[in-house]
Amino acid sequence: MVKLTSIAAGVAAIAAGVAAAPATTTLSPSDERVNLVELGVYVSDIRAHLAQYYLFQAAHPSETYPVEIAEAVFNYGDFTTMLTGIPAEQVTRVITGVPWYSTRLRPAISSALSKDGIYTAIPK
């Protein structure tokens, strides 16, 4: 015979597992929510590797960045509102334009999107 407390514990464990599982959403890669996650990772990476970004900028002076990104890098508060409205193609250009995109940024962006329950799909 199964004790009622065992059943209650099992139900609670299942409920906790369901509550802990993030909801998933499939979005276009150009959706602003995707862009904000990407830019959040990008700003964090710049902060962590500032000297590397300065060297890259010095070697590629024609590569420009939206002023909102520079402001977000040096503003240690909530910067997400600063980054809204940057066009998706500009987000893609600045993020994929650095040599460490494939090795450092892309995996970090994928992880951050997955953690937020966001998956991207190319629109048909």
Swiss-Prot record:
- InterPro entries tied to this protein: SRP1_TIP1 (IPR000992), Yeast_SRP1/TIP1_CWP (IPR050788)
Keyword field contains Signal: yes
- Any one Gene Ontology cellular component term annotated for this protein: fungal-type cell wall
Signal peptide span: 1-20
List UniProt keywords, sorted A-Z.
Signal
Pfam families recorded for this chain?
SRP1_TIP1
| Listed GO MF terms | structural constituent of cell wall
Q: Which Gene Ontology BP annotations are present?
A: fungal-type cell wall organization
Protein family membership: Belongs to the SRP1/TIP1 family. Seripauperin subfamily.
Name recorded for this polypeptide: Seripauperin-15
* Higher taxonomy: Eukaryota, Fungi, Dikarya, Ascomycota, Saccharomycotina
